[in-house]
């Protein structure tokens, strides 16, 4: 893991609390985000003042970042790299405290405020169980085990780096288990299978998209206001799915940080792409490639790669072999992100061989 990473401020992150009629609807989205420039500006200012301008580290799709101790201590979980870095500008006692709270934090993203510097609550069902083992190879499930592990880390694995202003930063790095991605994926497999059955979407496609979108990070957020495991954007895909379900408005952040609801919404959107926006593509493999690309860039952008007229674009796709559709979308889509997205999801999907009624087959 890199010792420090620079991220652009995420323009939405966890918005100020809004008053909505219920947890499912967030029609006050505009009001909910009016004060975010001030909020994110202050957040950035706090970090700049304490850590320095080149040390801005914030949460993203595949990175959990939480500040504590008035921003003097922070925890960073890289879900891609499978590594946890906990560092402080304070003394070892702060590091010790943060190690324990990070190891024992819960999986409920709604209960963790990434915009404050308060402690993360200790959970009786820690998220990192199964993903991290201590120096004796044991699971870290309670305060006693976490405390012993923290003491071991401080005595044997403590490292120091220096900021540009010369201030020392003490830190420890905790590796996740080698198969950490598969462990996280398996946790959500029952929910994935439920959604796959409900909407008729291949389980391996859902897994491939989730791995590419968030690396199965339940705390995932992004600069594009995408939320949760399947990175659903509330006011676009979320609103479309609510309309499909006969609901008004759009899903709230709390709604989308619920894994079951997030997965259901993401998979429902895939069915909209398949049955509505990309309807007319006859070859199932060609349609799958188009669906994957459209999940990232939108169906309109995908069709315009072939022609500005929708019907002509569909006809062109239908005259091509799936391999040709794949090549065009991965080389000629105007968005580099979309080109790479199809490559990544297709590769990830191939790595999953999900067998019905079994949960032990993930790679």
Curated annotation (Swiss-Prot):
It is a lipid-anchor. A lipid is attached at residue 16 (S-diacylglycerol cysteine). It comes from the Bacteria. A lipid is attached at residue 16 (N-palmitoyl cysteine). Its EC number is 4.2.2.n1. It is found in: Cell outer membrane. Residues 1-15 form the signal peptide. The keyword Metal-binding does not apply. GO terms for biological process: cell wall macromolecule catabolic process; cell wall organization; peptidoglycan metabolic process. It catalyses: Exolytic cleavage of the (1->4)-beta-glycosidic linkage between N-acetylmuramic acid (MurNAc) and N-acetylglucosamine (GlcNAc) residues in peptidoglycan, from either the reducing or the non-reducing ends of the peptidoglycan chains, with concomitant formation of a 1,6-anhydrobond in the MurNAc residue. The keyword rRNA-binding does not apply. One of its GO terms (molecular function) is hydrolase activity, acting on glycosyl bonds. Keywords: Cell outer membrane, Cell wall biogenesis/degradation, Lipoprotein, Lyase, Membrane, Palmitate, Signal. One of its GO terms (cellular component) is cell outer membrane. Murein-degrading enzyme. May play a role in recycling of muropeptides during cell elongation and/or cell division. HAMAP family: MltC. Belongs to the transglycosylase Slt family. This is Membrane-bound lytic murein transglycosylase C.
């Amino acid at each position: 893991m890199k010792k420090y990473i620079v991220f652009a401020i995420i323009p939405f992150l966890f918005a100020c609390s809004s008053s909505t009629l219920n947890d499912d609807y967030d029609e006050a989205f505009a009001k909910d985000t009016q004060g975010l420039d001030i909020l994110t500006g202050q957040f950035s200012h706090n970090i700049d003042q304490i850590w320095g301008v080149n040390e801005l580290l914030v949460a993203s799709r595949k990175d959990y970042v939480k500040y504590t101790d008035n921003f003097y201590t922070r925890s960073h979980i890289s879900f891609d790299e499978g590594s946890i870095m906990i560092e402080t500008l304070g003394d070892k006692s702060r590091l010790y405290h943060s190690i324990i709270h990070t190891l024992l934090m819960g999986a409920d993203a709604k209960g963790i405020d990434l915009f404050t510097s308060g402690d993360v609550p200790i959970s009786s069902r820690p998220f990192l169980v199964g993903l991290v083992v201590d120096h004796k190879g044991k699971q870290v499930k309670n305060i006693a085990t976490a405390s012993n592990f923290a003491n071991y880390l401080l005595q044997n694995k403590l490292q120091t780096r220096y900021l540009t202003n010369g201030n020392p930063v003490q830190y420890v790095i905790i590796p996740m288990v080698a198969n950490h991605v598969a462990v996280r994926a398996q946790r959500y497999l029952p929910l994935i299978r439920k959604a796959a059955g409900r909407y008729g979407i291949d389980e391996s496609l859902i897994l491939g998209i989730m791995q590419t979108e968030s690396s199965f990070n339940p705390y995932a957020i992004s600069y594009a206001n995408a939320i949760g495991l399947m990175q659903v954007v509330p006011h676009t895909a979320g609103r479309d799915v609510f309309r499909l379900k006969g609901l008004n408005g759009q899903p709230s952040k709390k709604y989308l940080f619920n894994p079951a609801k997030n997965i259901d919404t993401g998979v429902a959107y895939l069915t909209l792409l398949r049955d509505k926006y990309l309807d007319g593509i006859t070859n199932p493999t060609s349609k799958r490639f188009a669906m994957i690309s459209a999940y990232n860039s939108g169906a309109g952008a995908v069709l315009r790669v072939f022609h500005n007229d929708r019907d002509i674009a569909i006809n062109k796709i239908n005259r091509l072999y799936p391999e040709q559709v794949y090549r065009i979308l991965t080389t000629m889509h105007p968005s580099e992100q979309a080109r790479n997205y199809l490559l990544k999801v297709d590769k990830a999907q191939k790595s999953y061989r999900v067998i019905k009624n079994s949960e032990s087959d993930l790679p």
